[in-house]
């Protein structure tokens, strides 16, 4: 087996992966064209979980250096969230909107107090209408945090204070509750946190461009418990009313999309119930409800939860809750992608440019794999040396395939040649390539990350297709340098067009991945020359010109 035939193996694996990606993408809810009503049936369904829907209240805004939140005083839900450090598109001055409440699309972070005496319990009437001393809160330059207290007093005189605390540069929102019991009997309350979202994206929010070369990232719900580090929960599963219902200590519930995460993290020592719910009208929810606590007459008790609403920055999320960093969707090759990203981030801390960091990590990966690459070329050289003997054996045995196979294996054994030796390094390289593919497409640090010259976003395709063409040229050069024993006309034609086929595929790949492949090909050319020189000394290679 020679190096050009190996390209056929790569192509087969590559195309199979692209087809699988397209199939996975087709299984998810598709962007919707029609207007979706979101305000009629949510209340009743949510009430089944002890979580009523929001009503009309006053909207207050909270702005820090990185977040701008809109909170409805009816229930104290966060109805909008703007990420000020992340533009909507590369050239846009408009910030990315993560949470949103419109007739077409709803994505909210709800929270409050349920339980027997909780003001958010539907049995106790409408959701609490909190009072607040002003409608706009802005983090001053001299402040490190900002506190927004919302207060509600029920008919019995019990005072419930819901406090949002945001820190400078942070995406973790502390949501605290103070329950002051003014009655003559104990109050039984539970905290809840719920994320609800329209399952089908409107076209205005669709981030998937479609096609075989589009990276599909998971959009849906997820949770973590004391027994399960991380598990995804598809929106389709919730729409089919196959709902989650699990009790656990610790953990979190979340909704994910490419680059961004919203998650509720209960802050208590008791047991929490994690659930999902189909709220009707195409809206799904995931949330938690804590076990009840008793607040004695004349006493004040404090409860706590944390909301992460922002970019999926792994180290910062891991500091908020164990395993929350796993919400960065690196797919089934996460165990390779995560170490690669940590290495890439370490290199970036010195270079300050993600593109050059990718180049360095390419040299590191190819350097580590050099022994396998050398073994691959050595195996292929030995296979070429055996071709005259194999051809003579085939002519001698004619159509007796069984004897051909037996004698061929005996020949390999006698000559100490592994017929699969040329394939194994390729099989090892493919997962690394795909892991980089996932890493570059799911790491928010690479979103809109510039390189040099015309490459302003390493996570997006080359707008002028220059990098894919360079990649195709390096692939063509490697092909021309590689000796071949392929005589089948069809295989020869396929291999001739292989650089063109790969160039077309790479037109829509992230620029960072194309940079990796170009540098990898250049390293291959250098390594190829070094290996061939060593093989020449052993009489396993000669620098004869390839026949065109």
Swiss-Prot record:
One of its GO terms (biological process) is protein insertion into membrane. The gene is yidC. One of its GO terms (cellular component) is plasma membrane. InterPro entries: Membr_insert_YidC, Membr_insert_YidC_N, YidC/ALB3/OXA1/COX18, YidC/Oxa/ALB_C, YidC_ALB_C, YidC_periplasmic_sf. It comes from the Bacteria. It is a multi-pass membrane protein. This is Membrane protein insertase YidC. HAMAP family: YidC_type1. PANTHER family: CYTOCHROME C OXIDASE ASSEMBLY PROTEIN COX18, MITOCHONDRIAL, OXA1. Its main location: membrane. Residues 29-41 have a biased composition (Low complexity). Interacts with the Sec translocase complex via SecD. Specifically interacts with transmembrane segments of nascent integral membrane proteins during membrane integration.
């Amino acid at each position: 087996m020679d190096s050009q035939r190996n390209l056929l193996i790569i192509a087969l694996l590559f195309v199979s992966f692209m087809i699988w990606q397209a199939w996975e993408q087709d299984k998810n809810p598709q962007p919707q064209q029609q207007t979706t009503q979101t305000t009629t049936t949510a209340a009743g369904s949510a009430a089944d979980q002890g979580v009523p829907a929001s009503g009309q209240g006053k909207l207050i805004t909270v702005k820090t250096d990185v977040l701008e939140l809109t909170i409805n005083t009816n229930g104290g839900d966060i109805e909008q969230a703007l990420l000020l450090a992340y533009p909507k598109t590369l050239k846009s001055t408009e910030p990315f909107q993560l949470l949103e409440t419109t007739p077409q699309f709803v994505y909210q972070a709800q929270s409050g107090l349920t339980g027997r005496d909780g003001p958010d319990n539907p049995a106790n009437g409408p959701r609490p209408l909190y009072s607040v001393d002003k409608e706009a809160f802005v983090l001053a330059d001299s402040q490190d945090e900002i506190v927004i207290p919302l207060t509600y007093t029920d008919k019995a005189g019990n005072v419930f204070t819901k406090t949002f605390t945001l820190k400078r540069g942070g995406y973790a929102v502390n949501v605290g509750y103070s329950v002051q019991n003014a009655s003559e009997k104990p109050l039984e309350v539970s905290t809840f946190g719920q994320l609800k979202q329209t399952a089908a994206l409107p076209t205005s929010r669709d981030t998937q461009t479609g096609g075989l070369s589009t990276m599909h990232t998971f959009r849906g719900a997820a949770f973590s418990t004391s027994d399960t580090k991380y598990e995804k929960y598809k929106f389709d599963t919730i729409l089919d009313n196959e709902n989650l219902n699990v009790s656990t200590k610790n953990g979190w519930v979340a909704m994910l999309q490419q680059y961004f995460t919203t998650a509720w993290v209960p802050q208590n020592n008791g047991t929490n119930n994690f659930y999902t719910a189909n709220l009707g009208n195409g809206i799904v929810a995931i949330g938690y409800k804590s076990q009840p606590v008793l607040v004695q007459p004349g006493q004040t008790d404090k409860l706590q939860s944390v909301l992460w609403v922002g970019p999926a920055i792994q180290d910062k999320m891991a500091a908020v809750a164990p395993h929350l960093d796993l919400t960065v969707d690196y797919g089934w090759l996460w165990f390779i992608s995560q170490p690669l990203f940590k290495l890439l981030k370490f290199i970036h801390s010195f270079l300050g440019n993600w593109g050059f960091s990718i180049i360095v990590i390419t040299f590191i990966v190819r350097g580590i794999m050099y022994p396998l690459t050398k073994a691959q070329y050595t195996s292929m050289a030995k296979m070429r040396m055996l071709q005259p003997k194999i051809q003579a054996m085939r002519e001698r045995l004619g159509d007796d395939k069984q004897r051909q196979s037996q004698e061929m294996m005996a020949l390999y054994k006698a000559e100490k040649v592994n017929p699969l030796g040329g394939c194994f390094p390729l099989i090892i390289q493919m997962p690394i390539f795909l892991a980089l593919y996932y890493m570059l497409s799911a790491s928010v640090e690479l979103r809109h990350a510039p390189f040099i010259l015309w490459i302003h976003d390493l996570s997006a395709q080359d707008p002028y297709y220059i990098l894919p063409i360079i990649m195709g040229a390096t692939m063509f050069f490697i092909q021309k340098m590689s000796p071949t024993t392929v005589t089948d006309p069809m295989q020869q034609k396929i291999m001739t067009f292989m650089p063109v086929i790969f160039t077309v595929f790479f037109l829509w790949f992230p620029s960072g991945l194309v940079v990796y492949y170009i540098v990898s090909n250049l390293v291959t050319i250098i390594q190829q020359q070094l290996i061939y020189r060593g093989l020449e000394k052993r009489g396993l290679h000669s620098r004869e010109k390839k026949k065109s």
